[in-house]
């Protein structure tokens, strides 16, 4: 499962910065072995000018900390076609299939003076470790669907090209903050944190992003986790 999300300005806190994107990804709890949500934040940047329209991203690959467990059976599947989801929007999927949403997400067209445009984002389970991310422009009658798939502790999202302006005729994601809240059913958790907090005191999240020009950039974010107190030695 994945995620991406936004705040006014750069990604806050101890985000890891690279030439093409700043990255922060965390669980919503620091407790080991607990049901958790996922909070993903990315600020996309052009490597030659951090204030310009970014080079469009084509694929996002997120690798979660060692020991992270996913349970596909917790959230029901939204099985409508991509076309129906695009035409009908959020209402096409049953509420129980919703995974999470964007908070302050934006994109850029590249047209002079256009700046950043708000994007509404909602994600739905699609079954068989797959999910779909529905993006909707707040200013234009435009919806797009990004397909995601999970393998082990890795989640991959393929981002479609969208219409835009110069220099490439495409739109580009700028700010992303996607929050997937915790989900559980019958003692099962859709996502569960690793059983242990390692001796480093942090869990490591990794991102590998591929861009329209063929560029690939990797980044890492380390989240503090809660170590269990050692039992006292009996005398």
Language model segments and positions:
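Ser/Thr/Pro/Gly-rich, low-complexity intrinsically disordered stalk/linker tracts of secreted
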Residues: 16-235
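C-terminal segment of classical bacterial N-terminal signal peptides
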Residues: 6-15
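Sec-dependent N-terminal signal peptides
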Residues: 1-5
